[in-house]
Protein backbone atom coordinates (compact mmCIF):
# COMPACT_ATOMS: atom_id res chain seq x y z
CA UNK A 1 0.00 0.00 0.00
CA UNK A 2 1.00 3.65 -0.43
CA UNK A 3 2.58 4.54 2.92
CA UNK A 4 1.52 8.18 2.78
CA UNK A 5 -1.60 9.14 4.68
CA UNK A 6 -3.22 10.82 1.65
CA UNK A 7 -4.28 9.23 -1.63
CA UNK A 8 -2.17 9.88 -4.71
CA UNK A 9 -5.05 10.34 -7.16
CA UNK A 10 -7.68 12.80 -6.01
CA UNK A 11 -10.08 15.36 -7.41
CA UNK A 12 -11.43 15.21 -10.94
CA UNK A 13 -9.83 13.27 -13.77
CA UNK A 14 -11.23 13.30 -17.29
CA UNK A 15 -11.72 10.04 -19.18
CA UNK A 16 -10.69 11.55 -22.51
CA UNK A 17 -12.63 10.98 -25.73
CA UNK A 18 -10.77 10.14 -28.94
CA UNK A 19 -11.88 12.46 -31.77
CA UNK A 20 -12.14 11.10 -35.31
CA UNK A 21 -12.29 12.86 -38.69
CA UNK A 22 -13.07 10.97 -41.88
CA UNK A 23 -12.48 7.71 -40.07
CA UNK A 24 -9.03 8.59 -38.74
CA UNK A 25 -7.93 9.88 -35.33
CA UNK A 26 -8.08 13.68 -35.28
CA UNK A 27 -4.86 14.33 -33.39
CA UNK A 28 -5.16 18.11 -33.68
CA UNK A 29 -8.62 18.09 -32.10
CA UNK A 30 -7.35 15.76 -29.37
CA UNK A 31 -4.49 18.15 -28.62
CA UNK A 32 -6.93 21.03 -28.24
CA UNK A 33 -9.11 18.95 -25.92
CA UNK A 34 -6.11 18.21 -23.71
CA UNK A 35 -5.16 21.91 -23.58
CA UNK A 36 -8.74 22.82 -22.71
CA UNK A 37 -8.73 20.35 -19.83
CA UNK A 38 -5.49 21.72 -18.44
CA UNK A 39 -6.56 25.34 -18.67
CA UNK A 40 -9.76 24.42 -16.81
CA UNK A 41 -7.65 23.17 -13.89
CA UNK A 42 -8.30 19.44 -14.34
CA UNK A 43 -6.50 17.40 -11.69
CA UNK A 44 -5.48 14.42 -13.85
CA UNK A 45 -6.17 12.97 -17.30
CA UNK A 46 -7.18 9.45 -18.34
CA UNK A 47 -6.63 8.78 -22.05
CA UNK A 48 -7.13 5.42 -23.77
CA UNK A 49 -9.89 4.12 -21.53
CA UNK A 50 -13.54 3.23 -22.23
CA UNK A 51 -14.55 6.77 -23.17
CA UNK A 52 -11.62 6.89 -25.59
CA UNK A 53 -12.99 3.94 -27.62
CA UNK A 54 -9.69 2.18 -27.00
CA UNK A 55 -10.80 -1.28 -28.24
CA UNK A 56 -11.28 0.32 -31.67
CA UNK A 57 -7.82 1.94 -31.82
CA UNK A 58 -4.68 0.58 -33.45
CA UNK A 59 -1.49 0.39 -31.41
CA UNK A 60 0.20 3.17 -33.37
CA UNK A 61 -2.82 5.41 -32.78
CA UNK A 62 -2.74 4.69 -29.04
CA UNK A 63 0.94 5.55 -28.90
CA UNK A 64 0.51 8.80 -30.83
CA UNK A 65 -2.37 9.85 -28.56
CA UNK A 66 -0.32 9.19 -25.43
CA UNK A 67 2.74 11.01 -26.82
CA UNK A 68 0.59 14.02 -27.77
CA UNK A 69 -1.01 14.08 -24.33
CA UNK A 70 2.33 13.76 -22.55
CA UNK A 71 3.98 16.53 -24.58
CA UNK A 72 1.14 18.96 -23.90
CA UNK A 73 1.02 18.09 -20.19
CA UNK A 74 4.81 18.44 -19.88
CA UNK A 75 4.70 21.89 -21.48
CA UNK A 76 1.84 22.93 -19.18
CA UNK A 77 3.64 21.65 -16.08
CA UNK A 78 6.80 23.55 -17.01
CA UNK A 79 4.85 26.77 -17.53
CA UNK A 80 2.69 26.54 -14.42
CA UNK A 81 4.52 24.33 -11.94
CA UNK A 82 1.31 22.32 -11.47
CA UNK A 83 1.52 18.54 -11.73
CA UNK A 84 -1.17 16.79 -13.79
CA UNK A 85 -0.74 12.99 -13.80
CA UNK A 86 -1.56 10.99 -16.94
CA UNK A 87 -3.32 7.72 -16.09
CA UNK A 88 -3.40 5.42 -19.12
CA UNK A 89 -5.99 2.74 -19.78
CA UNK A 90 -4.08 -0.53 -20.24
CA UNK A 91 -6.42 -3.30 -19.12
CA UNK A 92 -7.68 -6.24 -21.17
CA UNK A 93 -9.08 -9.67 -20.32
CA UNK A 94 -5.65 -11.26 -20.82
CA UNK A 95 -2.84 -10.89 -18.30
CA UNK A 96 -0.17 -11.19 -20.98
CA UNK A 97 -1.78 -8.54 -23.18
CA UNK A 98 -2.28 -6.17 -20.25
CA UNK A 99 1.40 -6.52 -19.32
CA UNK A 100 2.40 -5.94 -22.95
CA UNK A 101 0.25 -2.79 -22.97
CA UNK A 102 1.92 -1.47 -19.82
CA UNK A 103 5.37 -2.22 -21.24
CA UNK A 104 4.36 -0.47 -24.48
CA UNK A 105 3.09 2.69 -22.74
CA UNK A 106 5.58 2.96 -19.88
CA UNK A 107 8.44 4.66 -21.79
CA UNK A 108 6.10 7.21 -23.36
CA UNK A 109 4.77 9.13 -20.40
CA UNK A 110 2.27 7.00 -18.50
CA UNK A 111 2.31 8.04 -14.83
CA UNK A 112 -0.06 5.24 -13.82
CA UNK A 113 -2.33 2.61 -15.34
CA UNK A 114 -6.08 2.11 -15.17
CA UNK A 115 -6.77 -1.62 -15.43
CA UNK A 116 -10.30 -2.94 -15.85
CA UNK A 117 -11.59 -6.08 -14.16
CA UNK A 118 -11.22 -8.71 -16.92
CA UNK A 119 -14.31 -8.80 -19.11
CA UNK A 120 -16.04 -11.75 -20.82
CA UNK A 121 -13.97 -14.36 -18.91
CA UNK A 122 -16.05 -13.80 -15.72
CA UNK A 123 -13.24 -14.52 -13.23
CA UNK A 124 -13.95 -15.51 -9.63
CA UNK A 125 -12.87 -13.26 -6.76
CA UNK A 126 -9.73 -15.39 -6.35
CA UNK A 127 -9.02 -15.03 -10.06
CA UNK A 128 -9.47 -11.26 -9.86
CA UNK A 129 -7.11 -11.05 -6.89
CA UNK A 130 -4.41 -13.12 -8.57
CA UNK A 131 -4.81 -11.22 -11.85
CA UNK A 132 -4.39 -7.77 -10.30
CA UNK A 133 -1.54 -8.94 -8.10
CA UNK A 134 0.27 -10.20 -11.20
CA UNK A 135 -0.50 -6.99 -13.12
CA UNK A 136 0.91 -4.84 -10.32
CA UNK A 137 4.02 -7.00 -9.97
CA UNK A 138 4.72 -6.50 -13.69
CA UNK A 139 5.13 -2.71 -13.41
CA UNK A 140 6.76 -0.21 -11.08
CA UNK A 141 4.01 2.32 -11.79
CA UNK A 142 0.82 2.82 -9.76
CA UNK A 143 -2.20 0.76 -10.79
CA UNK A 144 -5.84 1.81 -10.40
CA UNK A 145 -8.46 -0.96 -10.58
CA UNK A 146 -11.52 -0.25 -12.73
CA UNK A 147 -14.66 -2.05 -11.55
CA UNK A 148 -17.50 -1.69 -14.06
CA UNK A 149 -19.61 -4.88 -13.98
CA UNK A 150 -22.19 -3.45 -16.37
CA UNK A 151 -19.55 -3.69 -19.10
CA UNK A 152 -17.39 -6.58 -17.91
CA UNK A 153 -19.90 -9.10 -16.56
CA UNK A 154 -17.81 -9.46 -13.39
CA UNK A 155 -18.01 -7.46 -10.17
CA UNK A 156 -15.05 -7.01 -7.84
CA UNK A 157 -16.41 -7.39 -4.32
CA UNK A 158 -15.35 -5.05 -1.53
CA UNK A 159 -13.35 -7.74 0.26
CA UNK A 160 -11.23 -8.39 -2.85
CA UNK A 161 -10.51 -4.70 -3.35
CA UNK A 162 -9.58 -4.29 0.33
CA UNK A 163 -7.19 -7.28 0.19
CA UNK A 164 -5.47 -5.86 -2.89
CA UNK A 165 -5.22 -2.41 -1.28
CA UNK A 166 -3.60 -3.94 1.79
CA UNK A 167 -1.38 -6.54 0.12
CA UNK A 168 -0.05 -4.99 -3.09
CA UNK A 169 2.11 -1.86 -2.72
CA UNK A 170 1.45 -0.23 -6.09
CA UNK A 171 -2.28 -0.87 -6.33
CA UNK A 172 -3.22 2.62 -5.21
CA UNK A 173 -6.88 3.07 -6.09
CA UNK A 174 -10.12 1.90 -7.64
CA UNK A 175 -12.49 3.51 -10.11
CA UNK A 176 -15.79 2.19 -8.78
CA UNK A 177 -18.66 2.06 -11.28
CA UNK A 178 -20.67 -0.83 -9.87
CA UNK A 179 -23.52 1.42 -8.74
CA UNK A 180 -23.66 -0.64 -5.52
CA UNK A 181 -23.42 2.00 -2.83
CA UNK A 182 -23.24 -0.45 0.07
CA UNK A 183 -20.27 -2.12 -1.62
CA UNK A 184 -18.63 1.26 -2.26
CA UNK A 185 -19.13 2.26 1.38
CA UNK A 186 -17.53 -1.02 2.50
CA UNK A 187 -14.51 -0.28 0.29
CA UNK A 188 -14.14 3.26 1.63
CA UNK A 189 -14.36 1.99 5.21
CA UNK A 190 -11.93 -0.88 4.67
CA UNK A 191 -9.06 0.46 2.55
CA UNK A 192 -6.09 2.46 3.90
CA UNK A 193 -6.46 6.24 3.91
CA UNK A 194 -3.76 6.37 1.25
CA UNK A 195 -5.95 4.42 -1.21
CA UNK A 196 -7.91 6.42 -3.81
CA UNK A 197 -11.57 5.49 -4.16
CA UNK A 198 -12.78 7.26 -7.30
CA UNK A 199 -16.31 7.47 -8.62
CA UNK A 200 -16.81 6.00 -12.07
CA UNK A 201 -20.23 7.62 -12.41
CA UNK A 202 -20.63 11.40 -12.43
CA UNK A 203 -24.14 11.18 -11.00
CA UNK A 204 -23.07 9.52 -7.71
CA UNK A 205 -19.85 11.48 -7.21
CA UNK A 206 -21.36 13.72 -4.55
CA UNK A 207 -22.72 10.76 -2.57
CA UNK A 208 -19.41 8.93 -2.81
CA UNK A 209 -17.26 11.90 -1.85
CA UNK A 210 -19.54 12.77 1.05
CA UNK A 211 -18.93 9.19 2.22
CA UNK A 212 -15.16 9.60 1.94
CA UNK A 213 -14.22 8.91 -1.69
CA UNK A 214 -11.26 10.77 -3.19
CA UNK A 215 -12.77 12.06 -6.42
CA UNK A 216 -14.09 11.00 -9.82
CA UNK A 217 -12.93 9.82 -13.22
CA UNK A 218 -15.47 11.77 -15.20
CA UNK A 219 -17.15 11.53 -18.60
CA UNK A 220 -19.03 14.82 -18.22
CA UNK A 221 -15.81 16.78 -17.73
CA UNK A 222 -14.93 16.24 -21.39
CA UNK A 223 -17.53 18.88 -22.19
CA UNK A 224 -17.81 20.92 -18.98
CA UNK A 225 -14.34 20.77 -17.36
CA UNK A 226 -14.56 24.10 -15.53
CA UNK A 227 -17.83 23.20 -13.83
CA UNK A 228 -16.62 19.72 -12.90
CA UNK A 229 -13.44 21.07 -11.31
CA UNK A 230 -15.52 23.61 -9.37
CA UNK A 231 -17.99 20.90 -8.30
CA UNK A 232 -15.37 18.41 -7.11
CA UNK A 233 -13.34 21.05 -5.30
CA UNK A 234 -16.51 22.21 -3.53
CA UNK A 235 -16.91 18.64 -2.32
CA UNK A 236 -13.57 18.95 -0.53
CA UNK A 237 -11.14 17.44 -3.02
CA UNK A 238 -7.62 18.82 -3.22
CA UNK A 239 -7.19 21.61 -5.70
CA UNK A 240 -4.28 19.77 -7.31
CA UNK A 241 -3.54 16.05 -7.30
CA UNK A 242 -1.41 15.35 -4.24
CA UNK A 243 -1.85 18.83 -2.71
CA UNK A 244 -3.29 19.61 0.69
CA UNK A 245 -7.02 19.23 1.04
CA UNK A 246 -9.19 22.30 1.16
CA UNK A 247 -10.08 23.17 4.73
CA UNK A 248 -13.69 22.02 4.51
CA UNK A 249 -16.24 21.04 1.88
CA UNK A 250 -18.68 23.74 0.81
CA UNK A 251 -21.85 21.68 1.09
CA UNK A 252 -24.21 24.42 -0.06
CA UNK A 253 -22.15 25.16 -3.17
CA UNK A 254 -21.63 21.49 -4.04
CA UNK A 255 -25.35 20.76 -3.69
CA UNK A 256 -26.26 23.74 -5.88
CA UNK A 257 -23.78 22.60 -8.54
CA UNK A 258 -24.94 18.99 -8.34
CA UNK A 259 -28.55 19.84 -9.10
CA UNK A 260 -27.46 22.24 -11.82
CA UNK A 261 -25.23 19.61 -13.46
CA UNK A 262 -27.39 16.55 -12.92
CA UNK A 263 -29.42 16.89 -16.16
CA UNK A 264 -26.14 16.86 -18.08
CA UNK A 265 -24.86 13.87 -16.11
CA UNK A 266 -28.03 11.99 -17.03
CA UNK A 267 -27.85 13.05 -20.68
CA UNK A 268 -24.32 11.63 -20.95
CA UNK A 269 -25.70 8.12 -20.43
CA UNK A 270 -28.99 8.04 -22.37
CA UNK A 271 -27.02 6.05 -24.95
CA UNK A 272 -23.80 4.06 -24.57
CA UNK A 273 -20.83 6.16 -23.48
CA UNK A 274 -19.14 7.98 -25.26
CA UNK A 275 -21.93 8.49 -27.82
CA UNK A 276 -23.76 11.34 -25.99
CA UNK A 277 -20.67 13.22 -24.78
CA UNK A 278 -19.22 13.15 -28.29
CA UNK A 279 -22.47 14.69 -29.51
CA UNK A 280 -22.05 17.40 -26.87
CA UNK A 281 -18.49 18.16 -27.97
CA UNK A 282 -19.61 18.28 -31.59
CA UNK A 283 -22.39 20.74 -30.75
CA UNK A 284 -19.73 22.90 -29.11
CA UNK A 285 -17.65 22.78 -32.29
CA UNK A 286 -14.74 20.96 -30.64
CA UNK A 287 -14.83 17.66 -32.56
CA UNK A 288 -16.59 15.96 -35.46
CA UNK A 289 -19.42 13.72 -34.30
CA UNK A 290 -17.73 10.51 -35.40
CA UNK A 291 -17.27 7.17 -33.68
CA UNK A 292 -15.88 3.85 -34.83
CA UNK A 293 -18.10 0.84 -35.34
CA UNK A 294 -19.72 -0.83 -33.55
CA UNK A 295 -20.56 2.58 -32.04
CA UNK A 296 -22.55 5.07 -34.12
CA UNK A 297 -23.54 8.72 -33.58
CA UNK A 298 -26.49 9.48 -31.32
CA UNK A 299 -30.13 9.74 -32.28
CA UNK A 300 -31.78 13.06 -33.10
CA UNK A 301 -33.56 12.92 -29.73
CA UNK A 302 -30.26 12.64 -27.86
CA UNK A 303 -28.73 15.47 -29.88
CA UNK A 304 -31.71 17.69 -29.07
CA UNK A 305 -31.43 16.76 -25.39
CA UNK A 306 -27.73 17.62 -25.39
CA UNK A 307 -28.43 20.93 -27.09
CA UNK A 308 -30.98 21.75 -24.38
CA UNK A 309 -28.85 20.84 -21.35
CA UNK A 310 -25.67 22.44 -22.72
CA UNK A 311 -27.62 25.59 -23.50
CA UNK A 312 -28.88 25.81 -19.93
CA UNK A 313 -25.30 25.47 -18.68
CA UNK A 314 -24.15 28.28 -20.96
CA UNK A 315 -21.88 26.14 -23.14
CA UNK A 316 -23.59 26.88 -26.46
CA UNK A 317 -23.38 30.26 -28.15
Predicted feature locations:
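A general structural signal for well-ordered alpha-helical segments in protein cores
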Residues: 30, 62, 66, 98, ...
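Active-site beta->alpha loop and helix N-cap motifs at the rims of alpha/beta catalytic domains
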Residues: 2-14, 18-153, 163
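C-terminal alpha-helical cap/extension of soluble enzyme domains
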Residues: 8-19, 36, 40-42, 51, ...
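Short helix-capping segments at alpha-helix termini
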Residues: 72-83, 108-109, 139-141, 167-170, ...
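Helix N-cap/beta->alpha junction signal
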Residues: 94, 201-202, 299
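Catalytic alpha/beta core domains of metabolic enzymes, predominantly
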Residues: 137-138, 151-269
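Glycine-rich phosphate-binding "P-loop"
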Residues: 147-148, 170-171, 292-293
Amino acid sequence: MNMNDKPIFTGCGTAMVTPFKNGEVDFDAFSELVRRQLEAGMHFLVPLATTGETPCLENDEKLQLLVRCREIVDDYEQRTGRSVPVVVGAGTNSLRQTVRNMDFFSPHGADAFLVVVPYYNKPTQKGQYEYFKAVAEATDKPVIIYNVPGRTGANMEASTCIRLAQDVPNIVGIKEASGKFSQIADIIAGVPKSFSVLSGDDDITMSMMNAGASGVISVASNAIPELMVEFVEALGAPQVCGADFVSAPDMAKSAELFYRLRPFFSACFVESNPIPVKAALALMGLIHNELRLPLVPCSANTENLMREVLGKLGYLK
